[in-house]
Structures are given as structure tokens and as C-alpha cells.
Amino acid sequence: MPILERFGAKINSIIGLTISSVLLCIFSSQPFLAARVLDYACSCQPEVSPKGEFRYESKHVRLPKTPAEEITIEEITDWIPQYFPGETFSPETPRQDRELRLFHISHAFLQAAWINRRDCDFHLEISPNEKKDSFRIIVEMTKEYCSERKELQTQMAAKGFILDEKLREFEQPLPVEVVGLAFQDNAGPRGSSKVNSLWEIHPAIVKIVSPRELQKIK
């Protein structure tokens, strides 16, 4: 075999082995990456103790098994704060009045999401329509809802969205429905600049719905 042919065959062999090695590394790492993603849903460890969290006991409750009241995001943003508007209230304040009621938002769009490692809650920003400049409220899924969080995070990953400690925007907002308890948070930085209400749905269960299902809801 001529020297150039032998040299070319050797180069092709090296390139083939290199590509195979790279592909092997990529595919072998995928289960690990998937495990890390799903681990946030069920095995996230809070960085702050419950005593260091604002109204921790009030946030981390189970949803009541009662019929939910239908509500819209527009109606929620019209709610008046029930705890000293504009002032700080006790971090031990128990749930009362509206915060004891279960609500259902049948029409909303998931605009942004991140994980708060302080308490491991999923922070989700939803709007009444899919416009990126639309006003939003915050919805939080607590670690008590492991399976629901895992399902949501898996659906996000399937659409190429990475859910972690960084607040990220969805290029194409996702249609969702929400059921959960009303909750008034304290004033302060809580998400993007488009969030304009102290009222949240927290805890909540959030489900991605198909555009066809959303049309039926309308």
C-alpha cells in the first residue's frame, strides 16, 4: 500500500475513534443528567432551615380536598393585600381569610421559572395571555408535591427548558392550568419585573395543557 494511502487510512481511523469516544461520553452521561434534573423535583435539600424562611409553616401545607373556586389572573391582581399594605408583617403570620380558600385558574401561560434553593420551591410566573410583556403573578410548587413537580419538570425538559436556580424565560410561553391556595407574600424582590402582585397561588399544582384543551376552556 502506498505511503499516502496508509497515512490517510490511519488518519481516518483516528478520527473515527475520536468521534466514537465523544459520542460515547455524551450518551453515557445522559442518564446522569436526567437524574440530576429529576432530583430537583423530589430530593432537593433546602439551603435554609424552616425557621429562616418567611411564613414557612403557612406555605408548606397540603391542599384541601374541597371544590376549587374559579378565578382569573386579572381578578387576583385586583385583590387588596390583607396584611398591612406596604409594611412588613410577622414571618409567623398564619393563614387566614382568603388564604384558606382553594382556587382554580383554568386559563394561564407559563412565562418563566426557576428553583429557589432556599426552600426548594418551584417559582413559576404565569400571565393571562402569551404576550411576553404581559403582567404576571407567582405560583409556587412546594416539595410536598414531588410527583407533580417531577411531571412538570419532565415536560419542561422535553421542550428544551432547563429548570434550575436561574430565572429563565420561555421563548414560547406554555399554556397551563393551576389549582392551589391563595397566599400573600412579603414585599421585596420575588421574580421578574413583570410580577405586579403580592398575591400568589402557593402551594399549587401546575399542569401543562395542550392548545386544544385551552381552546375548550375558553
Segments predicted by a language model, with ranges:
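OB-fold and OB-like single-stranded nucleic-acid-recognition modules
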Residues: 35-218
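Residues at the start of alpha-helices and the adjacent loop-to-helix junctions
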Residues: 13, 26-27, 99, 172
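N-terminal secretory signal peptides that target proteins for export/translocation
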Residues: 1-11
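Bacterial N-terminal signal peptides
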Residues: 16-29
